[in-house]
């Protein structure tokens, strides 16, 4: 069963669609998708976040909607993109009862918060509210991660 079956998403930025195929999720340079022209409000959020975290490379940008009462089942994200970038969770609409969980932590964020999170460990989401939960995931290679990678 698909762990994300209760969720719908809009990819705003990711690998160029011309690269669609077996290696689509391999190492790539992300590009903006045309949908960005319809939701330009995303841009200042993303670029302000890049500046705030000393971002040096912008990866995927994903907007997700989890229906009221919906769940994203426990899972670990894998692959190049999941391992390469730092992940930032930006709740856009997150009513009381919509929680983001890891084995050792549960958060119930407010709209407008920003949380850095690891998606390469077990995590899940429960929307126990009466409205859709809408969030943006921004993937950024930070200066701190680059320095850490160089020290290995």
Q: Each PLM stretch: what is its role?
A:
Residues 63-82:
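Conserved short histidine dyad/triad with adjacent acidic residue
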Residues 73, 91-110:
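A short beta-strand-loop-beta hairpin characteristic of the jelly-roll/cupin
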Residues 74-75, 98-100, 117-118, 122-130:
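Short beta-strand His + acidic residue motifs that chelate non-heme Fe in jelly-roll/DSBH
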Residues 108-119:
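Short secondary-structure subsegments characteristic of cysteine-rich extracellular domains
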Residues 150-152:
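Acidic/negatively charged segments and metal-coordination signatures
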